[in-house]
Amino acid sequence: MNKLTEQHLLKKSRFLKYSLLASISVGAAIPFEGMAMSKEAFRIDLSNKLLNHVSQLNGYKDTTNNTPQQIGKVIVSEPKINTYTPSEIREMKISNKPKASNPLKDVPIEDHYKVVARSKSDVGTARKVRPITRCKTFAGIEKTEQSQNTYTPESTEQMPQKPEIIITASSPTVSPASNSFITAPNTPNTTLTSPEHYTTAPGTPSSTPATPYQSTSDSKPNDSLGANTPPNINTNSKAVRRLSFSSSGPQQQAVQSSSQVKSEVPPKPTFVPLPIKKSSTEIVAGMVSNISRVNEMIGIKLAEVTQAIDTTDKKDKERLQKLYTQLTSTQKTTEKLKSRAEEIETKIKIGENKDKIKKLEKELTSKNNKADRLFQKIEKIDIPANKVSIKSQETVPVTTASTEVSAFQAQQARINEARQGVFNKNKSSGGNARKSSAGTKREKKKQEAQKQLSEIKKQEKAIKTASDKAKEVAASAKKETSRTALRAMQDKMNGDSEQLNKIEENLKLLTPVVYNSSTGPTYKQSPKATPTIPLSHGVQRILGEQPEDEEGYLVPIKVQQQPYQEIEDPIPSHSKDIYEAKVSQYINYLNSIQPNQSNQAQIDSVIDGLATEMRKFSADQFSQKLGEIAHLASIKAYEGLFEKLYEIQQARILETQKVYEQAEISQSYAEYEENSRKSSIPVLSRSSSAKSVISSNFEEKSALLQTTTTDESLRSDNNWKNSAPYSSSPKLDKRGLEYLDLAGDAFVQNLKQPDTLTIETLGLITPTQNTTVAKSDSSRKNNVSGSISEIQQLQSEKMRTETLGVQDDLGLDLHYTPQETLTEKSTYLVSSKKKQGNIIKRAVSKVGSILQTNYAENRRRKRDGETSKQRTVDQEGEFGHAWGNENHKESSLSVVSGCIKKATQLISLLDAKRTAILQTTSPSQRRSVSLVLQEIENDYREAIKISQKLQQVLIRKPEDIKAYNAKAEKKLDAIKSRADKHFNNIETDVDVGFNPNGGNSHSMPTANMDILPKNLAVTPPTNVGSLYNSPQAQQFQEDHKNIIINDRSQGRLNLVDSTIVRELTDVDASIYNTAPPEVLKEAEALLDRSQGRLNLVDNTIKKGTQPLSNLSTIYESVSYENLASETIYKTEQPKPSISYTNTSKRKLPIPLFRSAELDKKLEYLDLEDKLLEVEEARIVKEKEAIAKLNQYQDPENLEFKRLAMEALDLSSKESQLKQKRKAIEAEFSLNEKSSSTDVSILRSYSIDDISGVLSDAESNLSRSPSVSGLEDLNNSNVMQLEELKSKHEKIANDYNKELELDTLNKEKIWLEGEIKHLDTEFKPKVTESKPVFSCSSSVGSINSFSNDDDLSSRDVVTPVDTLNIEINKDYVDTYIRVLSNKIQKIEEIQKIEELSGSSSRSEELNHIKEAMAYISNRIQDVEELDEKMLLAINAQLQEHDEKISSLLREEATDILAQLLLQEMLVSDGKSESTLPAGDEEQEDTEVSRQLSSLPALASSNESALALSDDREKECLALGDSSEDEESYDSGFEEEEETIGQLSDSDGDNLKITEVDTVIPLEQEAKKEMQTQISENAPTLNQAKVVNTIVNNMIRNRLDASMNMSNNMVAVGAGDEEESHIKRGLWMRGMYGTNNHGRVENMTGYRGTNKGATIGFDAEIDNNIVGIAYSNVHSVFKFKNSKNNDKELINSHVVSIYGQKELPKNFALQALVSASKNFIKDKTTYSYGDTKIKSNVKHRNHSYNAEALLHYNYLLQSKLVITPNIGLRYGKSRDGVYNETGVNVQEIALTMKENNILSGIVGTKVTVPLKDALKFNNLGLIFQGAVEHNFKEKTQRINRVVKIFDNTFKHNYLIPKQPKTSYNLGTGIIGSIKNTTISLDYNYYLNKHYRSHQGSVKLKVNL
């Protein structure tokens, strides 16, 4: 619709509207002039005019008015003042004419509109006249209405406004035709006023002369009417035509001057046409206003029609009722339209999206057009003319008389009064309507808020949908890594179970072999570094623990063992051949695919191809690729791959042995040794020491082979690979290195085959440089040394030495080597023949023990792998080894090795002597030396701790090594000196041995010394069985035998008592009574200790050839010195050297043992069986627990995350338990040492002999009391395992509950954090030519690295999956806003720099402006962007400076993260509006609930706000308001430091994250926030109120004591006086209210106080001293707060008071109190439309002291007047606090302090009363006091508030208290027996403060 058409329609509607209104107003405001006529004459004249008017409309001209300009216009003149006198009016002739017919009677209502519309063509000229204005003129007291025209030379267009319709009561008027008074019918007269006033057409004679006027407030100055009107004035004003009923020429009218003018109420604006370009909100508002106007018009019409129905006859009622029905239906329609429009307005305000808004705009436009059409129809409605009964009257000639004028004026005054009354009534009704509409608006706002909440919930659902998508992204990203990590954790947990199962199977298989073999050395395997798995950052966040380094190893920082790494071989390895590319493709495929049944066949083909290609690799390439696929070992589908690789590796060993000859190796070694000496490189010489190192290397290779060549070890070791080359000699080629690498493997394979166990493999080995070996058991260090030629000679004599008779040619010479170091002198001086015999002896005796020991040692190696430190064996002190990386040298560990050995010796010595003391002292003697034993025990534990620290220490600098070594040695020397002192004070026997009979006889069995050869020295076993066979243990077993049997028979599974376990196993029972993993560790420790006892029993069985009853025992004494030298910690002590000499073929005598001794030793076999049963039960329960654990393998599962964290710490716990086990093993080192002191085999024995011995042993074991104890121990372990099962079931239940509770909080926050973390952490840089507006998240497979590769040369597997996040259009909008903000900042910086003469930001500013210009030219609307445009813009922006890209990456990411954060905060803050005002508990709960999710949020926010650049930024921290009172700052110095950092720094230096907010904050919102901050500061010292209350309570106590004494004096001499009370206990409860007004700009408060005081005092000679404690709880609510802001104070007050009686009726009272107030502030700030809640906790310390001097004056009327005067000093100090809350980044308030010194003057009157009821000494108390402040010192406060990106600072000056305060009070006191009761009331007031307080006191005289 164009503008022309719109104006045309507007003119048309206005004409129809005001034509209708003019016709309606005929009977209400008819113009008159001259003498009034009668009513009948007026009606007749009006009927004639109407008839003429209708005839003119129908085309007939009126004879009385031929002017064409008057057609279609109605001139409604204002009522004029009558100029006729009363006498003239009375003389008028009044004639009664017949009633005229109504010309519109037969015209239907619908045709009225047509009739009026026909006059449109005849009134065109009338629209060019300026509209007249209307004014109200007052003549004296009477009010009249006048009209005038205003003409302007300029064309103006006046907007149409809503007409004002005033309904007045019926009043007499004057007809202009009849010049007589008439009375209108009883219908309300209607006066119409409008900006478009009635006018007279040009050239038309006016019916009234001009009248002076005064303009009203809604009119403009106009010209006069009548003759003064300029003719032919043509204007563009939109005047409304009037129908003129004037039929006569101009008439005279008297002029009445006006003296008063009263402005008229301005008319309401009419409907404004909608502009073409207006917002939807303005359109809706205009529509609602338009509908309201239409509805109001309909109401007016209804009122008129209703009145007309009541006053008309029956003929017209039917027509009027139809009209009434139409108006009613129209009104209902408009009401519906209005409600619909309001709903649309609400929806537009909420705003879902722009498309919906456009639809609503179209709908509103159509509704508005419909409303216009409806309004036009309403305007056309006309009230039938016949509703007014018009009676014709005769025309009376007009005469002038003063009396008639006065009467008319009086009549007019009554009319005006009536109109004014109606106007006032309408005005009051309008005011009520406005109030009701305001209430309606408030209700609508509430409804709107409810709708907004529903919309917010919808947005939250959208966020949840996005979270689900993020969950899918995270799940796909973690799919590969999580599975591997979980498998590794499970394998780590059940690794021990599988190892124990194998041990059990091997023991069962080796049972018949163990009994016919001798004890041989066990092989200690070198502990390996804990395998590590490189994980992605996503998995690390799931596990909740940061990695140790950038690669992200799945090992906790505290317990991660540094991997051992060989020094890199300078010899280049083989280059990668063509097969490596295929292998890499296969490996990538296996990493990316998810195994299932459908693709299993394809996986098998890939496995076959991979194995075929790897078969072609060299050793290095094979090991490297093997490390890359090690993480796949836990997947069942890939088991076949590792079986094939194992076969390939074994085949390579055999091939290598065939290829290389010994001569090549010897020649290579000789060249290497010579070159090394020339280059000053230390070389192992061909001596026994060198061979010891070589042998140790073979042990390491044995351990490596056992752990890396089995399918089971592949699952538990991800670094399964071959070791690095051993030699770095440039002359040693690749073949030699490989042969050296595999020679040890071949040696170990031979060791596993007892029938081929020879030493020929020693001829294949060469020394290695910098070889890392682990600590091995002492039993493994019996290594044969000699030259290579001697070793080769042994091979030819192998078959000759395999006979059993070779023992006749052997002689044994056992002695110990020095314990500190290994030197070349420590050799085995043996002949080749004796060496052969030693080898055969080991092969025959330990054929089964090797495998058993290897499995046990493999289990211990895995358990110790994370804590034990590998050492470099370096006899000459010149070998080093890389520790973790090349910067950490092993020299630190080599230096302190001497201290480790020294600590080990000291531990063994302490343990041996402690055991000796226990064995050589009786129970009665043991009590006397208990303190000494305790000191020894403490020293023993301290030595163990020092040894552990020495093993774990890692020092880089040599000077630090020496200092640490000296410090450790100093501690060890101190321990040794203390131990020697303790041992010297205890007298014990020198002989320590094994006494099977008990008592104090301690000697050791040995052979007959007379017949032993002189060159054979035998070190007998020491302390064997001392634990189980001590007198105390036997006595204990006998005492508890019956108890154990009963418990077992009744099925009771009792936990083992600590004393029982200590006596039976020498192990603390707390280990058994705790968690099952610790029980497992102790069971393993017992199993290890039992190994030595099995060897002892084995030797005993093999030696026993005579019947057990005939055995005898020979004992040999052993000194303490020998015992100490033999008791060496097993991991450090070398085995004794054995020297063989030719003793011809003499046989050794058979040692004799008692049968009882064998019985005791066989009990150890039972111990082994019972331990195996324990392990079986544990394995079953652990498998059940693991099955339970498998139920929680969902990566998003919270319980699984917790279990994953526990699994990470498993290695640390195992390490701790291992250390504890080692400490316990030290106590049994003597027993384990016995395995190395074997006596040579003298003769063979048969299986029948062994069977007989075993049957006897079983019968003895069945009677052994230790069996019962072990069964109970087993039962105890079963109970612990049952508890483990119940614990896992409880975890499942708790997890389900926790999952339900945290679904809407923790999961949402965590997942949102995941989204933003992926968005920020993986955001690419522009320098890498990646899109600026796109984010990518890549998840790589696990990167495995070889130990022999440097960190810089590790191969990283390419990512297998890349997930591109959809481009977001918000990036563009955000980018634009960031650039705009940055331009402003740079311009500000430039202004400052220009002043200083420097400008460094101009280049960056130019780049930013270029980017802005490009974006503004390319982008007109962000909504029109698509993905291609975004990419094009991105490519263009990359051409700009890198600073722009960095800017986007840093700030835009931050803003987008804050967008999500704001949505979360808004959704979380939705419950704020639901909190009822005044409900403190519910509000506290709600605030706590909102802020308790924020610690998660804290960690989730930290991820959401993480930035991609390298700059350090602090993340937004949302404080926890639920912390308890213990979190308060304790010291004022710390508080001052905190506020100093906050208040003295500017916005950039504040420790607050600078975040750009997306919420636009208007200036008004900022001002409002600043006002709130200035008003809500807690600076009015509310804590001072509490101190005043408490002081009043205690002062009343002192006054009560004084009153009682006065009452007793006033009672009279005839009354009996109570006994003198010396002590009193009293309590007082109080309740009070207070009110503080506004001070300056500080908000006042209202508060309540409630509390209690308890005190105790003593009275001595009328002098009182006492102490009291008060606890008061106060709540202060701030005034002028719509958010229920309040302050809670919990006060603890301690007071000391006293009263001293002075001469001459004087008394002195003193009071000192100190209070500690815990304050909580709860404040809500209104920041625009945002409500920000904050919570604060801080402390206040207050101190008060006062002294009062009283004088007691007793009157004759028994009244007591007590005036008093005194001083009071008060000090209050608030602590610093930091305030945090939702959307509040930080609020800080400095410490404030207030000191007041005041004086007190008052008096008190006591009125005694007669005794009533059971009360005596009754009295009334009236008191008053005036307190004046002499000096008050306050402190200025600095406050800093940071909300979003706006910082508010405010400085406060605490307002001083009023100088004068008043305290008034009254009370009543009385006593019953020894109890005193008083009621008190106090009223305290000053200029700003009022307080009421009531209390009840009860005192009991003790």
From Swiss-Prot:
Positions with biased composition (Basic and acidic residues): 445-482, 863-874
InterPro entries named in the record: Autotransporte_beta, Autotransporte_beta_dom_sf
Biased composition (Low complexity): 199-212, 246-264, 1491-1507
Signal peptide, first to last residue: 1-28
Feature: compositional bias, Polar residues: 146-159, 168-197, 225-238, 423-439
Compartments reported by the entry: Cell outer membrane
Annotated ranges, domain Autotransporter: 1618-1902
Acidic residues bias spans: 1521-1538
Ranges for region Disordered: 140-273, 420-485, 707-729, 858-885, 1470-1548
Chief place of localization: membrane
Pfam family, one: Autotransporter
SMART domains found in the cross-reference section: Autotransporter
UniProt keyword list: Cell outer membrane, Membrane, Signal, Transmembrane, Transmembrane beta strand
Keyword field contains Transmembrane helix: no
Gene Ontology CC entries for this record: cell outer membrane
Coiled coil: none
The protein, known as: Putative surface cell antigen sca1
Organism: Rickettsia conorii (strain ATCC VR-613 / Malish 7)
